[in-house]
From Swiss-Prot:
Keywords: 2Fe-2S, 4Fe-4S, Biotin biosynthesis, Iron, Iron-sulfur, Metal-binding, S-adenosyl-L-methionine, Transferase. Residues 40-269 form the Radical SAM core domain. GO terms for molecular function: 2 iron, 2 sulfur cluster binding; 4 iron, 4 sulfur cluster binding; biotin synthase activity; iron ion binding. Binds 1 [4Fe-4S] cluster. The cluster is coordinated with 3 cysteines and an exchangeable S-adenosyl-L-methionine. Catalyzes the conversion of dethiobiotin (DTB) to biotin by the insertion of a sulfur atom into dethiobiotin via a radical-based mechanism. Its cofactor is [4Fe-4S] cluster; [2Fe-2S] cluster. It is an enzyme of class 2 (transferase). GO terms for biological process: biotin biosynthetic process. It catalyses: (4R,5S)-dethiobiotin + (sulfur carrier)-SH + 2 reduced [2Fe-2S]-[ferredoxin] + 2 S-adenosyl-L-methionine = (sulfur carrier)-H + biotin + 2 5'-deoxyadenosine + 2 L-methionine + 2 oxidized [2Fe-2S]-[ferredoxin]. CDD domains: Radical_SAM. This is Biotin synthase. It comes from Parasynechococcus marenigrum (strain WH8102).
């Protein structure tokens, strides 16, 4: 079995993949996945909101923005180092081997909050787990210090296509997102970068977002695929629910475009049937977020996920630290 790593996919080619009959798309994705990732296993990642609410950004989907009126927009102080590490230990005991930490910031703040972040990264790495941080934009020096602390990956999503982006956020440009990703790469930290469907975008928008990701050289090591969780008090609160099979198509297409990336089944999974989630695994998803909360939105509980993987006949990387994001 062979596959090709490409960075020259066109939007038209990607849209054609998204429009394939579902069974044909799944077959192609599974072929690429088996060729690129022998010994298929699912990585379990746990996600913790270290600093919740009070974010200056105006992302239309986000419950943590000060511009929105959800229940979690009020500022909460950053968690202390030891409670975060206690949560990391608990995540490891539950089977996760990657611990992701989120800060509701526009950009990383220097000083005590950043020093605490570095201590958290070191502590997670000392547990033998991968450490991922998502905290908005950052400087070259901050990226370098995170790399020195042992950070495995930095998450900074594109959210949507360049064409649809201004309908979702106005406080940060698409170019600023790309520049943040470049700083992370320059520091030697792996990228976790994906997007969200169900925000009123077109099929071409989805293809365009995937084209930006697939054009990166190298591809992002981790590609989270999210479905919108419509939160009361946000501009997208009345958005119609995304169609689960559309998320399956996004997973499959991401797998074809970026054969060796970890395609992460992320937010929105709680609203999907077990069968739709298993189809996502069949389509090439090889990571799930594990635990009953993703930052501020719900997620299937640990026991439900254990049963899901068992029923699918999929092995997880229980407490095995991987070298890729």
């Amino acid at each position: 079995m062979t596959f090709t790593i490409r960075h020259d996919w066109t939007i038209a080619e990607i849209q054609a993949l998204l429009e394939l009959p579902l069974m044909e798309l799944l077959w192609q994705a599974q072929y690429v996945h088996r060729a690129a990732n022998p010994g298929y296993r699912v990585q379990l990642a746990s996600l913790l909101s270290v600093k919740t609410g009070g974010c200056e950004e105006d992302c239309a989907y986000c419950s943590q923005s000060i511009h929105n009126s959800s229940d979690v927009t009020a500022f909460e102080a950053q968690m202390q180092v030891e409670p975060v590490l206690q949560r990391a230990r608990a995540a490891k005991e539950a089977g996760a081997d990657r611990f992701c930490m989120g800060w509701a910031w526009r950009e990383i703040r220097d000083g005590a909050p950043f020093e605490a972040m570095l201590s958290m990264v070191r502590g997670v790495r000392d547990l033998g787990m991968e450490a991922c941080v998502t905290a908005g934009m950052l400087s070259d020096q901050q990226a370098e210090r995170l790399a020195e602390a042992g950070l495995t990956a930095y998450n900074h999503n594109l959210d949507t296509s360049p064409e649809h982006y201004d309908r979702i956020i106005s406080t940060r440009t698409y170019q600023e997102r790309l520049e943040t990703l470049q700083r992370v790469r320059k520091a030697g930290v792996t990228l976790c970068c994906g997007g969200i469907i169900g925000m009123g975008e077109t099929l071409r928008d989805r293809a365009s977002m995937l084209q930006v990701l697939a054009s990166m050289a190298p591809h992002p090591e981790s590609v989270p695929v999210n479905g919108l969780v419509a939160v009361e008090g946000t501009p997208l609160e009345d958005q119609a629910p995304f169609e689960p099979l559309e998320l399956v198509r996004m997973v499959a297409t991401a797998r074809i475009l970026m054969p060796r990336a970890r395609v992460r089944l992320s937010a929105g999974r709680e609203s999907m049937s077990r069968e739709a989630q298993i189809l996502c695994l069949q389509a090439g998803a090889d990571s799930i977020f594990y635990g009953d909360t993703l930052l501020t939105t719900g997620n299937p509980d640990v026991e439900a996920d254990r049963q899901l993987l068992a029923d699918a006949g999929v092995q997880a990387n229980w407490q095995e630290c991987q070298t890729t994001a």
